[in-house]
Design a protein with these regions (language model features):
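Divalent metal-dependent catalytic cores for phosphoryl transfer on phosphate-bearing substrates
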Residues: 1-144, 150-151, 181-189, 252-254
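Low-complexity, highly charged intrinsically disordered N-terminal segments
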Residues: 141-249
Length: 254
């Protein structure tokens, strides 16, 4: 079991938790500070995975550039993974006062990908943890509020306290999928149709790929690799696809 890899994946999954804190009205600081402070103040993950605090606090360039971190800090990996998962260069946005409405609901992707006759704009309501339900987008105007996000952060905190030493990325991902799949990751984009969960899950996957590649190739200076001299032409990823057509007849006999 690679404890550093587990810590990295947990940190990547939680790197944007400050957005939920802000939207819940619990802290007005920038989300990187709000998230790190929340975990510290509630003594969450402090025993084994305290480095997660740095991954949350320093995942944007303006704080990371002046951070007193070791060259092998996992915060550098999360920083670059977050940039790639976002599909943008975060540096262009960090020093600008670009703010959307943090209470906007998640847009349906079919608001953009649609047939000619479909001009309805649909959004999702916040899912209420009903395991037997299915959350369909609606054309009704939906605005989320502080209490919606308070329920979410309390659900996450309760689970983190329950897991304690037995936490792992898979358990945390299940919790986040249940409560974070139906509100947007970013509030400053034109079309908020990427969910919070999808963004942090992708950030964690990219972080894990970086770490495993670097471990195999004996790369230990993450500060140089992911902050000072970023080289995105390195082939660190392998996308695997499979073809399962033709097995329907077998499936129907089960």
């Amino acid at each position: 079991m690679d404890e550093k890899l587990i810590c990295l994946q947990l940190g990547a999954l939680l790197h944007d938790i400050g957005k939920i804190i802000r939207r819940a009205g619990l802290d007005s600081k920038e989300h990187s500070k709000a998230g790190s402070n929340y975990l510290k103040n509630n003594n969450l993950l402090a025993d084994r995975y305290k480095e997660i605090y740095d991954m949350i606090y320093y995942h944007h360039a303006k704080y990371l550039s002046s951070a007193d971190l070791k060259e092998d800090s996992l915060a550098y990996i999360v920083y670059e993974a977050d940039n790639i998962a976002s599909g943008i260069d975060r540096v262009k946005y960090e020093d600008k006062q670009i703010r959307g409405n943090e209470m906007d609901s998640l847009n349906s992707i079919f608001n953009v990908i649609r047939i000619e006759k479909n001009n309805l704009k649909k959004t999702f309501k916040l899912f209420d943890f009903d395991k037997n339900g299915f959350n369909m987008p609606t054309s009704s105007s939906i605005k989320l509020n502080n209490s919606d996000y308070k329920k979410i952060i309390n659900h996450i905190k309760d689970n983190l306290n329950t897991f304690k030493e037995n936490i792992n990325p898979e358990k945390l991902a299940i919790v986040l999928e249940a409560c974070c799949s139906y509100f947007p990751s970013s509030s400053y984009v034109d079309t908020p149709d990427i969910s919070y969960y999808d963004h942090v899950k992708l950030t964690a996957a990219i972080s894990a790929c970086f770490y495993l590649y670097d471990k195999e190739n004996n790369i230990q200076n993450f500060k140089e690799e992911y902050f000072f001299t970023i080289n995105r032409s390195k082939e660190k990823f392998l996308l695997v696809s499979g073809e399962f057509s033709g097995i329907q007849n077998f499936i129907y006999t089960i």
